[in-house]
């Protein structure tokens, strides 16, 4: 375990306030000037443990005044900002791909909070002065260096003091016609989760994130790759603070700059660009660089006021776990809000309705329009995201980085258990563990564990203690070994066994049925449509088809009609309802493994015998 150097920075706040100034983030009409001065302090006890020499401290504090009141901004380096196998790529003039593994672990990007404030957060870069934002008493403040001869001068200002580059509200390309009804949102508030579901929701989840920068953005920043990389790092650092509220950690696994030419046809039609980017990720990127989710940053002006688009509920999908983002603002907080919004769609979250107002005076992340940066998901978004996780259980987000994969020096207090640590419950201020010593990241006397499904009262649970209940007919319970705090790997019943009173057959631990799929897509009080609705799948047009091939809808054979588009009905309605997303032809299709007849299941959009696939 390596203890971090604690440094206090005193900011001398001068009574000068500027009336208007042009900063990197745009025109600011009211600001304060401050002068940081660094004062090093030893850790508690007056002893500093030896640690590898780094350019940037692991932990820093900044003291300054806001509205005449002193505050202390506590910051800790964002330890997991980059994955262990992070790479960068650009292209030579002759088109050759040049991939490097730069040393990025000694970086200058921090997360933090105002001390003694429960509802506070911060995202700051300290690469060249202090640049970023922090939340204090419900207000968002920004700090950035003033480009004056006095290099220590910084400006502090409120979000409301930044003049808008364009007053027109920015929107997401996921249109209202593609939304689900309000009913699932209202009923979501009535959900009561089982203990097993609650445990799953509380487990830390990870997204290995890849960013591609198009040629227009490369030229916009005057072909300056270091400036582009710094902007992307700042964006991902902010994105991390936002997604942390959903218990996600974003690890940047790769960045590539299309410095020679674009790898796809980036066009003003945002839907076409998203589709092309998804295909490029599937065919070109994934074979050479694994990732859970990828976003394209572009300087093209999408049609209308659209600044981004993503497929709904598509995380971990090979083709659809993507988004396209217009780099439309100088302000990283604005663009990062859009990145979080589109990633929210990938995480199964739709746009907020008018009733979703739990973000104070600011708009929530999933608001339909944006004129100001946002940093919070509404309670509606959180519930919808939880429904998505419990329904789809995307597997890629559970890949926790191994301790040995973390190559930077261990930092006690960052919630990551690293080499030399037995536990990590956060800083002494935040730690709520009775088993872990927050100052040393070692287990307390006689404690065997600190956390985990098989850890109880600081001891390993007994052999045979149930740590994960069976989720349904197709799952099996897991039990503790008595030698570890972790629950054994999830196992399930073999594929093809009958489930849910013979309504379906087990498939990879789930019991896919038409009824359950209708409820998942449209909420409660829905049923499967009558059989005649499924004959529409023989037409090969509208919402009746089995697959897409070269942009054309391929009809189902008569025996396969219940393996194509899913048709549902509300209550006693006779209407044949189907759900379509223009950018995702697989949305609303009958799932693989669904029963389509006695002893028959859907496989590759065909109704086949159980014995041929299981």
Swiss-Prot record:
Keyword Cell inner membrane: no
Annotated signal peptide: 1-20
GO cellular component terms listed in the entry, alphabetical order: extracellular region; host extracellular space; plasma membrane
Record-annotated Peptidase M12B domain positions: 205-401
Cofactor list: Zn(2+)
Residue interval(s) of motif D/ECD-tripeptide: 473-475
Glycosylation sites (chain numbering): 187
Keywords: Cell adhesion impairing toxin, Disulfide bond, Fibrinogenolytic toxin, Glycoprotein, Hemostasis impairing toxin, Hydrolase, Metal-binding, Metalloprotease, Platelet aggregation inhibiting toxin, Protease, Secreted, Signal, Toxin, Zinc, Zymogen
Organism (species): Bungarus multicinctus
Single annotated GO MF: metalloendopeptidase activity
Catalytic residues (UniProt): 342
Phylogenetic placement of the source organism: Eukaryota, Metazoa, Chordata, Craniata, Vertebrata
Entry protein name: Zinc metalloproteinase-disintegrin-like BmMP
Location of the protein in the cell: Secreted
Family as reported in the entry's similarity comment: Belongs to the venom metalloproteinase (M12B) family. P-III subfamily. P-IIIa sub-subfamily.
Subunit structure of this chain's protein: Monomer.
Cofactor note: Binds 1 zinc ion per subunit.
Tissue-by-tissue expression: Expressed by the venom gland.
Binding site for Zn(2+): 341, 345, 351
């Amino acid at each position: 375990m390596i203890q971090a150097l604690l440094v206090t920075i005193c900011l001398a706040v001068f009574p000068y306030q500027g009336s208007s100034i042009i900063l990197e983030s745009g025109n600011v009409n009211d600001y304060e000037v401050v002068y940081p001065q660094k004062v090093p302090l030893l850790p508690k006890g007056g002893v500093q443990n030896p640690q590898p020499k780094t350019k940037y401290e692991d932990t820093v504090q900044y003291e300054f005044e806001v509205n005449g009141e002193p505050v202390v901004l506590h910051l800790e380096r964002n330890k997991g900002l980059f994955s262990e196998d992070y790479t960068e790529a650009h292209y030579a003039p002759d088109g050759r791909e040049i991939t490097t593994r730069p040393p990025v672990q000694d970086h200058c990007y921090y997360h933090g909070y105002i001390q003694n404030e429960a509802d506070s957060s911060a995202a700051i870069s300290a690469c060249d002065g202090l640049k970023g934002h922090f939340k204090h008493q419900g207000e968002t403040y920004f700090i950035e260096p003033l480009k004056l001869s006095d290099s220590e001068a910084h400006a502090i200002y409120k979000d409301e003091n930044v003049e808008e580059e364009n007053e027109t509200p920015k929107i997401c390309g996921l249109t209202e016609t593609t939304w689900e009804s309000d009913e699932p949102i209202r009923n979501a508030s009535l959900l009561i989760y089982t203990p097993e579901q609650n445990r799953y929701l509380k487990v830390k989840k990870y997204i290995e994130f890849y960013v591609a920068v198009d040629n227009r953005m490369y030229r916009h920043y005057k072909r300056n790759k270091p400036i582009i990389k710094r902007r992307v790092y700042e964006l991902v650092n902010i994105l991390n603070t936002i997604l942390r509220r959903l218990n996600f950690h974003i690890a940047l696994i790769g960045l590539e700059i299309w410095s020679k030419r674009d790898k796809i046809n980036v066009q003003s039609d945002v839907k076409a660009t998203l589709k092309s980017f998804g295909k490029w990720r599937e065919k070109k990127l994934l074979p050479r660089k694994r990732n859970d989710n990828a976003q394209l940053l572009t300087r093209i002006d999408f049609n209308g006021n659209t600044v981004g688009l993503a497929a709904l509920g598509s995380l971990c999908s090979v083709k659809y776990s993507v988004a396209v983002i217009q780099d439309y603002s100088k302000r990283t907080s604005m663009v990062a809000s859009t990145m979080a919004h589109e990633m929210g769609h990938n995480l199964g979250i739709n746009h907020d309705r008018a009733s979703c107002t739990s973000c104070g005076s600011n708009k929530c992340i999933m608001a339909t329009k944006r004129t100001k940066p946002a940093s919070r998901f509404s309670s509606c978004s959180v519930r919808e995201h939880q429904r998505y996780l419990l329904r789809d259980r995307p597997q890629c987000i559970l890949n926790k980085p191994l301790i040995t994969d973390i190559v930077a020096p261990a930092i006690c207090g960052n919630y990551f258990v690293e080499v030399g640590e037995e536990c990590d419950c956060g800083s002494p201020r935040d730690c709520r563990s009775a088993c872990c010593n927050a100052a040393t990241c070692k287990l307390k006397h006689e404690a065997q564990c600190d956390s985990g499904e098989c850890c109880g009262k600081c001891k390993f649970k007994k052999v045979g203690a149930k740590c994960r209940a069976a989720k349904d007919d197709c799952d099996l319970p897991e039990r503790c070994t008595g030698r570890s705090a972790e629950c054994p790997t999830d196992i399930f019943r073999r594929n093809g066994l009958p489930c849910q009173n013979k309504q379906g057959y087990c498939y990879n631990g789930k019991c896919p049925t038409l009824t359950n799929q209708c409820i998942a897509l449209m909420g409660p009080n829905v049923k499967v449509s009558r059989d005649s609705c499924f004959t529409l799948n023989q037409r090969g047009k509208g919402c009746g088809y089995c697959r897409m091939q070269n942009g054309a809808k391929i009809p189902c054979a008569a025996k396969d009609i219940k393996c194509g588009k899913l048709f549902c009905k509300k209550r006693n309605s006779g209407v044949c309802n189907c759900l379509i997303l223009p950018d995702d032809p697989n949305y609303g299709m009958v799932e693989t493994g669904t029963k389509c007849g006695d002893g028959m299941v859907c496989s590759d959009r065909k109704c086949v015998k159980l014995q041929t696939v299981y």
